[in-house]
């Protein structure tokens, strides 16, 4: 008799994806982030579900309902902070996952990569809408500033913004629809993640060398299940350290003040994981130009396969490209720092230089370096 996990229609799918899946024998810990993102998503859906049981999406009661969750609901405080800091862990894993893909040339799996970029946009949209829900000062003003950017779109901009708001300003209608979308999006993300995995399993995983590993595969279970469990334990450890010892470390104190349309906070800024894009937006003095740069800063990932001119897939054996990659990583950290600073000298010029560097490295320097390295191969 055949093993049930190989014959049962449902078990067979799970078996081929997580148990008997042939995996390269040499994938490093940088390949752990896919499973960590899955864990993050499950954690966010579960904590979010329990928060939604007590949250009210009305401007008059939203702030108080979050306070009620933290004060009166059994373990409400831990659920709330696990959800808020879980988002931070989600983005850390996301950026590491994308960085891994860029470093090792995983973007040559076109379908997987493109679905991944769509996933990144969806997760960013979900996180933005979630940040609006507690209805604190930064929630309200963040929503106002970011949605207002759409008014830069010629001709239809203003109508589009008012359509999204459901009125002439961010108000009850906006909060209610953001809650509805914030609830449904994680399930769309889960579906997209399955498609992402489906496309990945069409080709099999990449590996650090970027060379085909077809002749040297090992079963996913037990080797990579054990390896993934280590990653999961480290993820949960980091998350719980944040939640239990410094729950507000990554948040904004302004969000503990209820939303007030009459008082603008001195420094409007998004959560830390959007600061790099916010810095790029602010570095361009023109509104439409800033919005375009903001969108392109993420959309540029779609161009990665087109910009790949190297004869080698991975950066493992390309020291010059490695150097550029880590300069890009440092540049993103610089942009993240600048995004949280006030708009004054010297931060303005640093932000502008870092923004130019970001696009220059990806669009010009990386392909140029790859061509130089191609010439090295002839020696």
UniProtKB/Swiss-Prot annotation:
<comment type="function">
    <text>Component of the ubiquinol-cytochrome c reductase complex (complex III or cytochrome b-c1 complex) that is part of the mitochondrial respiratory chain. The b-c1 complex mediates electron transfer from ubiquinol to cytochrome c. Contributes to the generation of a proton gradient across the mitochondrial membrane that is then used for ATP synthesis.</text>
</comment>
<dbReference type="Pfam" id="PF00032">
    <property type="entry name" value="Cytochrom_B_C"/>
</dbReference>
<feature type="binding site" description="axial binding residue">
    <location>
        <position position="196"/>
    </location>
    <ligand>
        <name>heme b b566</name>
    </ligand>
</feature>
<dbReference type="GO" id="GO:0045275">
    <property type="term" value="C:respiratory chain complex III"/>
</dbReference>
<comment type="similarity">
    <text>Belongs to the cytochrome b family.</text>
</comment>
<feature type="binding site" description="axial binding residue">
    <location>
        <position position="83"/>
    </location>
    <ligand>
        <name>heme b b562</name>
    </ligand>
</feature>
<feature type="binding site" description="axial binding residue">
    <location>
        <position position="97"/>
    </location>
    <ligand>
        <name>heme b b566</name>
    </ligand>
</feature>
<dbReference type="InterPro" id="IPR005798">
    <property type="entry name" value="Cyt_b/b6_C"/>
</dbReference>
<feature type="binding site">
    <location>
        <position position="201"/>
    </location>
    <ligand>
        <name>a ubiquinone</name>
    </ligand>
</feature>
<keyword id="KW-0812">Transmembrane</keyword>
<feature type="transmembrane region" description="Helical">
    <location>
        <begin position="288"/>
        <end position="308"/>
    </location>
</feature>
<dbReference type="InterPro" id="IPR048260">
    <property type="entry name" value="Cytochrome_b_C_euk/bac"/>
</dbReference>
<keyword id="KW-0249">Electron transport</keyword>
<dbReference type="GO" id="GO:0006122">
    <property type="term" value="P:mitochondrial electron transport, ubiquinol to cytochrome c"/>
</dbReference>
<comment type="subunit">
    <text>The cytochrome bc1 complex contains 11 subunits: 3 respiratory subunits (MT-CYB, CYC1 and UQCRFS1), 2 core proteins (UQCRC1 and UQCRC2) and 6 low-molecular weight proteins (UQCRH/QCR6, UQCRB/QCR7, UQCRQ/QCR8, UQCR10/QCR9, UQCR11/QCR10 and a cleavage product of UQCRFS1). This cytochrome bc1 complex then forms a dimer.</text>
</comment>
<dbReference type="GO" id="GO:0008121">
    <property type="term" value="F:ubiquinol-cytochrome-c reductase activity"/>
</dbReference>
<keyword id="KW-0408">Iron</keyword>
<keyword id="KW-0679">Respiratory chain</keyword>
<keyword id="KW-0999">Mitochondrion inner membrane</keyword>
<keyword id="KW-0830">Ubiquinone</keyword>
<dbReference type="GO" id="GO:0046872">
    <property type="term" value="F:metal ion binding"/>
</dbReference>
<dbReference type="InterPro" id="IPR048259">
    <property type="entry name" value="Cytochrome_b_N_euk/bac"/>
</dbReference>
<dbReference type="InterPro" id="IPR027387">
    <property type="entry name" value="Cytb/b6-like_sf"/>
</dbReference>
<feature type="transmembrane region" description="Helical">
    <location>
        <begin position="113"/>
        <end position="133"/>
    </location>
</feature>
<dbReference type="InterPro" id="IPR005797">
    <property type="entry name" value="Cyt_b/b6_N"/>
</dbReference>
<feature type="binding site" description="axial binding residue">
    <location>
        <position position="182"/>
    </location>
    <ligand>
        <name>heme b b562</name>
    </ligand>
</feature>
<keyword id="KW-0472">Membrane</keyword>
<feature type="transmembrane region" description="Helical">
    <location>
        <begin position="320"/>
        <end position="340"/>
    </location>
</feature>
<feature type="transmembrane region" description="Helical">
    <location>
        <begin position="178"/>
        <end position="198"/>
    </location>
</feature>
<dbReference type="InterPro" id="IPR036150">
    <property type="entry name" value="Cyt_b/b6_C_sf"/>
</dbReference>
<dbReference type="GO" id="GO:0005743">
    <property type="term" value="C:mitochondrial inner membrane"/>
</dbReference>
<dbReference type="InterPro" id="IPR016174">
    <property type="entry name" value="Di-haem_cyt_TM"/>
</dbReference>
<keyword id="KW-0496">Mitochondrion</keyword>
<dbReference type="InterPro" id="IPR030689">
    <property type="entry name" value="Cytochrome_b"/>
</dbReference>
<keyword id="KW-0349">Heme</keyword>
<feature type="transmembrane region" description="Helical">
    <location>
        <begin position="347"/>
        <end position="367"/>
    </location>
</feature>
<dbReference type="Pfam" id="PF00033">
    <property type="entry name" value="Cytochrome_B"/>
</dbReference>
<protein>
    <recommendedName>
        <fullName>Cytochrome b</fullName>
    </recommendedName>
</protein>
<keyword id="KW-0479">Metal-binding</keyword>
<feature type="transmembrane region" description="Helical">
    <location>
        <begin position="226"/>
        <end position="246"/>
    </location>
</feature>
<keyword id="KW-1133">Transmembrane helix</keyword>
<keyword id="KW-0813">Transport</keyword>
């Amino acid at each position: 008799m055949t093993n049930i996990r190989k014959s049962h229609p449902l078990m067979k799918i799970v078996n081929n994806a997580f148990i008997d899946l042939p995996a390269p024998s040499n994938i490093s810990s940088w390949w752990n982030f896919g499973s960590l993102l899955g864990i993050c998503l499950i954690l966010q859906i579960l904590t979010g579900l329990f928060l939604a049981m007590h949250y009210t999406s009305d401007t008059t009661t939203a702030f108080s309902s979050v306070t009620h969750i933290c004060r009166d609901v059994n373990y409400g405080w831990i659920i709330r902070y696990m959800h808020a800091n879980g988002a931070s862990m989600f983005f850390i894993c996301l950026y590491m996952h994308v960085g891994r893909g860029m470093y090792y040339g995983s973007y040559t799996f076109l379908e997987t990569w493109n679905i991944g970029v769509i996933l990144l946009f969806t997760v960013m949209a979900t996180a933005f809408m979630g940040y609006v829900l507690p209805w604190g000062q930064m929630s309200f003003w963040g929503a106002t500033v970011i949605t207002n950017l759409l008014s830069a779109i010629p001709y239809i901009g203003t109508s589009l913004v008012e359509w999204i708001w459901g009125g002439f300003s961010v108000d009850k209608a906006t909060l209610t629809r953001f809650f509805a979308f914030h609830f449904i999006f994680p399930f769309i993300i889960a579906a997209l993640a399955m498609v992402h995995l489906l496309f990945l399993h069409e080709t099999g995983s990449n590996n650090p060398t970027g060379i085909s590993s077809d002749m040297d595969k090992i079963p996913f279970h037990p080797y990579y299940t054990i390896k993934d469990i280590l990653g999961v334990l480290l993820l949960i450890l980091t998350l719980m350290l944040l939640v239990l010892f410094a729950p507000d470390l990554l948040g904004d104190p302004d969000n503990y003040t209820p939303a007030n349309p009459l008082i603008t906070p001195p420094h409007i800024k998004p959560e830390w994981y959007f600061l790099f894009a916010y810095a790029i937006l602010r570095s361009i003095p023109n509104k439409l130009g800033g919005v375009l740069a903001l969108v392109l800063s993420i959309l540029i990932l779609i161009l990665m396969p087109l910009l790949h001119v190297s004869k080698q897939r991975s950066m493992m054996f390309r020291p010059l490209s490695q150097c550029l990659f880590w300069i890009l990583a440092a540049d993103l950290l610089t942009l993240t720092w600048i995004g949280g600073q006030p708009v004054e000298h010297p931060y303005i010029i640093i932000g502008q230089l870092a923004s130019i560097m970001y696009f220059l490295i990806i669009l010009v320097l990386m392909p140029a370096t790859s061509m130089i390295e191609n010439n090295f191969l002839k020696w």
